[in-house]
Amino acid sequence: TRNYVEAIRAVLPGGDVITVRRGSSMARGRDFDLVTESGRHITGRLPSYTVPKVKSAAGYYIDENMDLIDLFIGAEGTLGVITEIELKLVKAPAMRIGTVAFLQDRQSALVLVRALRKEALPEGTSPLPVLPLSIEYFDRRALALLKDQQQSNPAFSQLQPLPDGTPEAVYAEFDGADDDKAWEILSGLGTLVERSGGNEHDTWVALDGQKMEKLRFFRHACPECVNIQVDRCRKSDPRITKLGTDMSVPAQYLDPALDMYEKDLTDAGLNFVIFGHIGQNHLHVNVIPRSIEEYDKAKALYMGWARTVSAWGGSVAAEHGIGKLKVPFLRAMYSDSQLEEMAALKAVFDADGLLCAGNIFSSSPDSDMVSAVSASPASGADADTEEKESLI
């Protein structure tokens, strides 16, 4: 997302306003100097940590000599209130192709995913002429949940009939450009599906707006089905909430991550589905707890996964940020000293901790370092020019 943000205007806690345009304000190594519209200089030092080389929205984005507009993007409102934003638009594809391929098992689905990403090809096949615009994955439990809702809930009646058995699904969208390119993509995709263990004749294809809407309904129906199930469970115990991961891993850990999720959840006897943005190694594991005991058991598993994913070089929050509920996950990803650096960065912009209390950092003064940082500015920066960083 950040690559499409060209400029922002933000109001800081003291009332100062700052405008940052991409390419106009750069860090010098880890040091930065921003100038507000009133002429005040905001200076400080960026944290020393390195962000993981995966899709991530966990804490502040930090890099050597970085464009300082990226500090504010994904900062969860902890540095300033963004009042204006300028975006870069891209031309819509002339022909968008939507597809859903059904595979016999997870390994077959991963073979197709890697072929679509041009990482590894089944024997005797060629890569597609273009990379997909998106690749999504749905495990057999997710499809079973969809099928159950399709049969019992009129709201899901527009779903196309799902195949019999317990297949897995890979959804992909492409820029077809024109009829010739669309045919080349679909012909090649059919071969890849067959060589990955699927049947090209079972594959759903959409080439027009109406059919694309049906495929997109399928793509987005699974989270809604999970919400319906969780709402039913909440009637017996209102403490139960939806439990869904937002973790991403480096490509080489995609298989181990899926193995870990399935083994741990199956051994624990929990009801779950797995779906999400497999093109970026970013899957959502959703547990549907039937009791508060299962809810607590799932939360403990999630914490363990956060530690493992972090050790692999992944992110505990790939797209939804840390917020307030995932603060413990951030502690699994970064050390106390790195969190202190984040807090110092926030204090440069918000010395009194007025913005989004509890986001990224705990709002409890004895469980986080925010109050200490506010009272003791980082070295080399004035008390009113320190900022802290956020991951939730």
Label the predicted regions.
Residues T1-P122, A372-P377, D382-I392:
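FAD-binding subdomain of flavoenzyme oxidoreductases
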Residues G23, R140, G321:
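Short, ordered loop/turn segments at secondary-structure junctions
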Residues I73-A75, V81-G304, T308, W312:
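C-terminal substrate-recognition/cap domain of FAD-linked oxidoreductases
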Residues A206, V230, G321, A357-F361:
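Short coil/turn segments at secondary-structure boundaries
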Residues L207-Q210, I322-V327:
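Short, highly charged C-terminal tails/helix-capping segments
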Residues N286-E293, L325, F329-M333:
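Conserved PLP-binding active-site segment of the aspartate aminotransferase-like
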Residues W312-I322, A347, A351-L355:
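Alpha-helix capping/hinge segments and adjacent helical runs
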Residues V327-I392:
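Activity-critical C-terminal alpha-helical subdomain
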